[in-house]
Amino acid sequence: MDVLLYFGGDIQDTQENMKHAGSKAYIEWSLENTAKILTISFPKKHVFLIRPSRVLETLSYFDNFVPSKEYGIPVFCPTHNALKHLQELLKSSVNRINMYNTDKELTHLNIEKAKLTLVGFSKGCIVLNQLLHEFHYYQNKLDPDIEINNFIHLIESMWWLDGGHAGSKDTWIVEKSILESFAKLRIDVNVHVTPYQVQDSHRPWIGEEESHFCNILRNLGIPIKRTLHFADKTRSLQNHFNVLKAIWNYTQ
C-alpha cells in the first residue's frame, strides 16, 4: 500500500472556505484541486491531505504537529508527539476507509505494510521539519519506542516544496546533528524550490538555509534530488503554487 500524506500552505483550504475575497483568486489550489493534482503526479498512491488544525483568515496553523507562534511561525522542539499524532491520524483514516469499503474487489488498506511519502508545500514544510527533530529524538531515546521506530521505517520519501513561513529563521533545518540522524534513515529526499522563496531579497535566510540543508545532506552521503523551477521567470506567488504541478515531471 503506497500512501502520500500532504501538508499544505497558507491560503489552501476547502473550495467552500476559499470562496471569500482573501482566497478566491487562488481557488485553483484548493485542497480538492490539489488532491487531483497530486493524484496525477502520484497515480499509484493513496493521497491523504491533512488540514491544519486551525486557519485564521488565510494563515494555517499545524498546532497538533508543531507548536506555533503568531502567523503560524513554528517553534521546533525535540518532540511534540507529531509522529504519534500522524500515526494515529493515518490509522483512524484507514480504519474509516476500510469500514466503508464495500467493493469486494478492493483490497483493505493495511497501515503496517504501507510505504509512506510525506509532502510539505510552503507552510506545510514546518511539519516535515518538526519530524526531523523527532527522528533525532527517537534515535537518541534511552528507552526505545519500538512502535514509533517501526512507523518511522515506513517512510520511504519526503518532499519539500518551496518551504516558507513568516519567521526570520528555521525555514530549513540546518543543525548538523539532526540531519545526521535523518541521514541514517536513508529516506529519499526531494527538494523543489522557486525564486519566490529562495531568491527573496527581503528574506535572504531562506535561500541560505536551503543551500545549507542540501549541502549538509549531500556531505552525509544522501543523494538529494534538488530542483529550482521557474528560474528564468519573475518571482511570483502564482509560480510558487505552480511548483505543485511542476513536480509531475519528476515523479514519472
Which positions does each model-derived feature cover?
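Structural alpha-beta junctions
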Residues: 32-48, 154-155, 181-190, 214-226
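Short, surface-exposed "cap/lid" segments of acyl-processing enzymes
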Residues: 1-63
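Alpha/beta-hydrolase active-site loop
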Residues: 30, 60-110, 133-141, 148
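Serine-dependent carboxylesterase/thioesterase catalytic core
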Residues: 97-187, 198-201
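Structural beta-sheet core signal
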Residues: 6, 49, 118, 160, ...
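C-terminal catalytic histidine-bearing segment of alpha/beta-hydrolase fold enzymes
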Residues: 190-252
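Conserved beta-strand elements of beta-rich interaction domains across eukaryotes
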Residues: 9-12, 54-56, 123, 164-166, ...
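Short, flexible/disordered intra-domain loops and linkers
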Residues: 15-27, 59-74, 169-171, 199-208
